[in-house]
Structure formats: structure tokens, C-alpha cells
Amino acid sequence: MLFNNDSGNAEFTQFNKLAEKFGIQFNYDSKNHVLGNQYEMGAIQIDPGNLIFKSARKVYIKEYSSLAIHSPAAAVLKDGKTIVAAVARIGKGAVFAVGDPWFYNEYEDGRKIPVEFENYKAAEDLIKWLIYQINGR
């Protein structure tokens, strides 16, 4: 798992050297700026049938670094045409990358963001996918 942040809050040069091995680059940008408590500005919709996020449909991700990808990576979460998260399969393993640490920060537990955001459910979906990568393949 590769969790980065937006360009103002993370190191990119060395991290991208690792990510490039998997066909992933974290862009030096910051997407989904949110003003105050206007949480809807940080909303990302998840389509049914998503490879990883099988139950979550709407998550809150603000100020993330977008991704650029090439083989073997594939996008697994987009905001319009912008890639938010990707997966790369290498040999018997898999790498998940996302441009924000939204699975383990203050937006995860449902106390700060409105209930319609399903960040906790998305984190559960990711954990189930990770376990399947170990046990189910």
C-alpha cells in the first residue's frame, strides 16, 4: 500500500522512485479543495462494480495528489477523469496506491464528516480486498 498526500504535505521525489516500479506516479498537485465545512466539495462517487470498493458509494477525499499511471497499473478510483487510486499487479503480489491518507485520518471515523460519506465502509472494502490478495489468489 502506497499512501501519499498532496504536494504541499508530502515528499514526492523519493516516493515516486518507488511508485514508478509499479507504473504509478504521484503528481505534484492538490485536488478537491474544500472551503470550511462545505464537505460536498470533497465528495467522490464510487461506481457499482468497483474492483475494490464493493459496498462504499461516496467518500470524502480532500486535497489529494492525483496519479498518473502506465502498465502494469490500472485506475480503481477516479474523480471524473482524474485518477485518485490505482492498483498494480506484479508477479503474485498487488500494490494499492492513493494520493491521500484518508483511510486512517480524522475523516475515517464518521465524527467529523456527514454520515452520507462512507469512508469507513471504503476502508473495510480495502481491507477485504487486501485479505483476498493474500488468501484468495
Could you tell me what each predicted segment is?
Residues 1-8, 111-116:
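Second-shell loop/turn segments in exported
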Residues 5-90:
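An acidic, glycine-rich "communication" segment
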